[in-house]
Amino acid sequence: MTRARMYYDEDADLSVLDNKTIAIVGYGSQGHAHALNLKDSGIDVIVGLYEGSRSWARAENEGLAVYPTAEAAAKADLVMILLPDEVQREIYNRDIAPHLGTGKTLAFAHGFNIHFSQIVPSQEVDVLMVAPKGPGHLVRRVFTEGKGVPCLFAVEQDASGRARATAMAYARAIGGTRAGILETTFREEAETDLFGEQTVLCGGLTALIKAGFETLVEAGYQPELAYFECLHEVKLIVDLIVEGGLAKMRDSISNTAEFGDYTRGPRIVDERTKAEMKKILAEIQNGEFAKQWVLDSQANYASFKAMRRREAEHPIEEVGADLRKMMSWLRP
């Protein structure tokens, strides 16, 4: 197993961004964090939004110049697209691509649209990625505390010969090199990100939670207890894992729980599960998932909306809504 090399402040030259204007397209979770961190690092940063965006006034109130996306792209040397995957292609083709040319840089925080050829930039522009491994509010908060969130960075296209230095400088400007950044590729980031979401973090975890809840309720146990044991306490365990790995979690739980972990866990996630994971990974690698998602978005998200409605009606949601009213620490 080959370990990744980490890069820090001393490895990234912030002066690469001197006299450059960076346009942040989008002002959501990541957009506001990138823009404000860049601004605080002394970078000339502007924001590109559609006219009428609810974020327009917010960005201006936070001291940023805001322009319609096409105008921002025309003014910028580097355009960072921080929009949902499914809308990037349309906005890129309409508002950004006409203003890209020799010497300009196109940047992303996720490899999806480049790797799966939803966006195909001209050969004369640099294409890079800087992807913080944390939500925008965390990227912003720890930056203001003098720290940073680890980032991935990658170069897909290096027309200028300076794309890698630009990516590292950008990562430093948003605080990434304070914690450490590691180099990857658009392919590796896109495929591992989708795999993690589908098999573990989102798809795998929610399916496991629901199956556990349903098993207890079908066996006659009270749904409230099933909720506590199969959903509510997930956070307690995950927090321990994030803080110190699986070892800290196991050191913090009872011996009974740890013994059950070792003897029963592998019966739930076994070789059949791993075989299915490999199939899902193959569907990501060969573009099948990307094609399915793009086609559904083009059909006004018909399947996606139906699945969302169905999941919202699962009994665990009603039980959870009632129980969370009892938890004062969850209320603002």
Curated annotation (Swiss-Prot):
Active-site residues annotated for this sequence: H110
The keyword NADP appears for this protein: yes
Ligand binding (NADP(+)): Y27, G28, S29, Q30, S53, S55, D85, E86, V87, Q88, G136
Record protein name field: Ketol-acid reductoisomerase (NADP(+))
Source organism of the structure: Gloeobacter violaceus (strain ATCC 29082 / PCC 7421)
PANTHER family attached to this UniProt entry: KETOL-ACID REDUCTOISOMERASE, MITOCHONDRIAL
Cofactors: Mg(2+)
Matches recorded under InterPro entries: 6-PGluconate_DH-like_C_sf (IPR008927), KARI (IPR013023), KARI_C (IPR000506), KARI_N (IPR013116), KARI_prok (IPR014359), NAD(P)-bd_dom_sf (IPR036291)
Function: Involved in the biosynthesis of branched-chain amino acids (BCAA). Catalyzes an alkyl-migration followed by a ketol-acid reduction of (S)-2-acetolactate (S2AL) to yield (R)-2,3-dihydroxy-isovalerate. In the isomerase reaction, S2AL is rearranged via a Mg-dependent methyl migration to produce 3-hydroxy-3-methyl-2-ketobutyrate (HMKB). In the reductase reaction, this 2-ketoacid undergoes a metal-dependent reduction by NADPH to yield (R)-2,3-dihydroxy-isovalerate.
Pathway named in the protein's UniProt entry: Amino-acid biosynthesis; L-isoleucine biosynthesis; L-isoleucine from 2-oxobutanoate: step 2/4; Amino-acid biosynthesis; L-valine biosynthesis; L-valine from pyruvate: step 2/4
